[in-house]
């Protein structure tokens, strides 16, 4: 059984979502159509935290009860999952590098504000943008992201996400993943593959 562990970026990230629909609700409807065709052959999982986050964007009454039927909500078993020590070492080192980078961003902003006192507000906005990028881009920056990784490890699932941090750490931990930008094509191919398989069985 193929098991996919889904991130919100499939339905919320505009660049990814447009393959499924214009809005998160339309994207979810399209996805659920694929899930229906793959029912019994492919399973789709979400940690409860990710699911709750997603439902802030999706009109629940328009996707129920299918969303309950085709998306399995499961928390990772945080007490029994073993994390390799090197992952903790890498995470600590990554955080240290990001703190140093954040300090350099702040120092640059201070120097700019001393030189150009008339544009302090713009400099602060730039500081916030660059500081956020330095500290958060490419890292697991929420409990929900970490739950996604842990659940995929626990069930030997395939993570589907457009989040660079999630995919980077999935790779570090030896977890299979699919870029969310290609997920619709993957689903279409799976539907066709199973249809061909059924046709061959009927001919026999």
Swiss-Prot record:
Superkingdom, natural source: Archaea
Keywords: Endonuclease, Hydrolase, Nuclease, tRNA processing
Listed NCBIfam families: PRK04358.1-3, RNA_lig_partner
Function: RNA-free RNase P that catalyzes the removal of the 5'-leader sequence from pre-tRNA to produce the mature 5'-terminus.
Family: Belongs to the HARP family.
Protein name per UniProt: RNA-free ribonuclease P
EC number: 3.1.26.5
One GO BP annotation of this record: tRNA 5'-leader removal
Catalytic activity: Endonucleolytic cleavage of RNA, removing 5'-extranucleotides from tRNA precursor
One Pfam assignment: PIN_5
CDD domains associated with the record: PIN_VapC-like
Originating organism: Pyrococcus horikoshii (strain ATCC 700860 / DSM 12428 / JCM 9974 / NBRC 100139 / OT-3)
Sample GO molecular function, one term: ribonuclease P activity
